[in-house]
Amino acid sequence: MWINHEIEMKLYCNGEDDIDEEEIDEIKVEEMVEKILENKEYWDKKCKNLFADEFVDWFNEEKWVKPEYDEIYYETNSIDEVEKKLLKIIEKEDTEKIMKNNFLTKEAFKKLLDNEDMEITIDLTDDDENSFSITMYERLFFVDKIFYACCNFNGEIDEYYMG
């Protein structure tokens, strides 16, 4: 999907993910995957837009406390280093919104998703909660959100949410 993006596919049948292999119609599953992969650019754009809408709305609703960030923090020796990287990726106006006001625009978030210096991973934490992180040059930038897009057998998104 996006540069450095890891994709995990899960198969659900009637809302259950513990499925008896004999119940699975492998041809139907393969057809669904083919449909999704045939329209890669469409899915990239659609999922990216949905993800940006969900994540950015959540991000901007939070009341971040400076300099102690609640769920947003920087693991680096210098905040200036992070600011320089952001200036290169999302330019001055959006960088100032993040650094000064903790406000993220959807367009800036999409640029972060597309940047080769950003990596998106899905981790399983010790307490078995899914977590989502964007890493920039091994510096953690956002944490604790994951985007789910659930597709049906027609290759359409049935539902999507952040957890």
Feature annotation, model-predicted:
Residues 2-8, 113, 117-163:
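Acidic, proline/glycine-rich low-complexity IDRs
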Residues 1-129:
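N-terminal domain-onset segments
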